[in-house]
Amino acid sequence: MDYVLIVLPLALFLIAYKFLFSSKTQGFNLPPGPTPFPIVGHLHLVKPPVHRLFRRFAEKYGDIFSLRYGSRQVVVISSLPLVRESFTGQNDVILTNRPHFLTAKYVAYDYTTIGTAAYGDHWRNLRRICSLEILSSNRLTGFLSVRKDEIRRLLTKLSREYDGRVVELEPLLADLTFNNIVRMVTGRRYYGDQVHNKEEANLFKKLVTDINDNSGASHPGDYLPILKVFGHGYEKKVKALGEAMDAFLQRLLDECRINGESNTMVSHLLSLQLDQPKYYSDVIIKGLMLSMMLAGTDTAAVTLEWAMANLLKKPEVLKKAKAEIDEKIGEERLVDEPDIANLPYLQNIVSETFRLCPAAPLLVPRSPSEDLKIGGYDIPRGTIVLVNAWAIHRDPRLWDEPEKFMPERFEDQEASKKLMVFGNGRRTCPGATLGQRMVLLALGSLIQCFDWEKVNGEDVDMTENPGMAMRKLVQLRAVCHKRPIMTNLLA
């Protein structure tokens, strides 16, 4: 009798589950893919690094293939022509939505931030605010002094504490990029030396770390609904995390109202709130703050570390970049943002780093608002659509010797059109220009001010960390020697 009581409900569940899932995809001509297991689908196959696994699947099943994560259909695109088909015209409109995951419900204000909101009037308003009020060319130029100050602090620290010594770059680059964004948003420094308020800074760091650890689609309940019954602990955790971050951001807003801090994104948005409270509510401002401080930091720091790693592996490239800067800028002053236009080889180095080592190897997922076709296959409404940018950036059909670091390939202006570091279509990252400016200026300054060499002549480990963001598994260590320009800078 006990056996029947256990087996019968399980059998009924399996039958109901199979019926419910098959009814969602019945009659569709889905892209090919591996044979799924009952209930879990292909979850048992998904092992990091996922972008490399997906490239192997693409080699076997084609440039577009399908998987099943529990009850959710997943489609992965791995070719440039299919990406262009997906994100142009009406298809781009259909694919503007994001799939829903549990963390975003509680941390991203119930899917209302610019990164999570559904396509519609609310999202268009957020996009308008970003384009015109936060990340316009004039606004970014207005924050150039912040970028230059943070870079100068980094250069000074390297010169005084690490001249002729081994330095681990990742923590310093992370401090640089986090401080740049947080100062733009709030006017405060939370990382490195001379922080605004140590207690407040430590709380912010902990919240950011906890959100990053729980972000993405990491909870099985996102794919197997029955597990939500047993997953209340996780849901309570991310709910509490969202409430803690909201309280932190609200305190920053309230303090800014009282103190009237000038030339920050928050102060500018609060000034607009006075005339248009509907379009600049506290929730909208907090959502924009959250998006900037979470999404605007990782990419730049990761890209800078990969760029330096590639330069150490290719000293002839580093030498050529240094010669370009010395010729165009000299050693009497630091490279400045307006100089970047006259440093094409530096630009090519950054483009090649974006290509070979994208910080986000899989683009942020999309979800169609209605059924559509891609590559002749049916993509049902609600499917999780992923683009394997890493695989496309190494596609031998697009690139000569794709595994090699060769900045010269971007001397052909058409090459940059094949990059997709910041997404595609309507949901291209609104902070792309800011990220590029920061990486170019910081990398140019590091090349101009120091001679770099490997530690004891050892080869640079280029192994990837198996996470959603493609960091280096082994943090980059190098020896830096200050050049004469640093004497002038510190005088």
Swiss-Prot record:
Induction trigger: By beta-aminobutyric acid (BABA) and elicitors of pattern-triggered immunity (PTI), such as flg22 and elf26 peptides.
Keywords tagged on the record: Heme, Iron, Membrane, Metal-binding, Monooxygenase, Oxidoreductase, Plant defense, Transmembrane, Transmembrane helix
Keyword NADP found: no
Binding, heme: 429
EC numbers, comma separated: 1.14.-.-
GO BP annotations listed: cellular response to hypoxia; defense response by callose deposition in cell wall; defense response to bacterium; defense response to fungus; defense response to insect; glucosinolate metabolic process; indole glucosinolate biosynthetic process; indole glucosinolate metabolic process
Involved pathway(s): Secondary metabolite biosynthesis
Any GO MF annotation of the entry: iron ion binding
Top-level EC class as recorded in UniProt: oxidoreductase
TM stretches of this protein: 283-303
Co-factor(s): heme
Assigned GO CC terms: membrane
CDD domains in the record: CYP81
Subcellular location(s) of the protein: Membrane
Membrane topology of the entry: Single-pass membrane protein
Primary role: Involved in indole glucosinolate biosynthesis. Catalyzes hydroxylation reactions of the glucosinolate indole ring. Converts indol-3-yl-methylglucosinolate (I3M) to 4-hydroxy-indol-3-yl-methylglucosinolate (4OH-I3M) and/or 1-hydroxy-indol-3-yl-methylglucosinolate (1OH-I3M) intermediates. These hydroxy intermediates are converted to 4-methoxy-indol-3-yl-methylglucosinolate (4MO-I3M) and 1-methoxy-indol-3-yl-methylglucosinolate (1MO-I3M) by indole glucosinolate methyltransferase 1 and 2 (IGMT1 and IGMT2).
Family: Belongs to the cytochrome P450 family.
The protein's name in its UniProt record: Cytochrome P450 81F2
Provenance organism: Arabidopsis thaliana (Mouse-ear cress)
Upper taxonomic lineage: Eukaryota, Viridiplantae, Streptophyta, Embryophyta, Tracheophyta
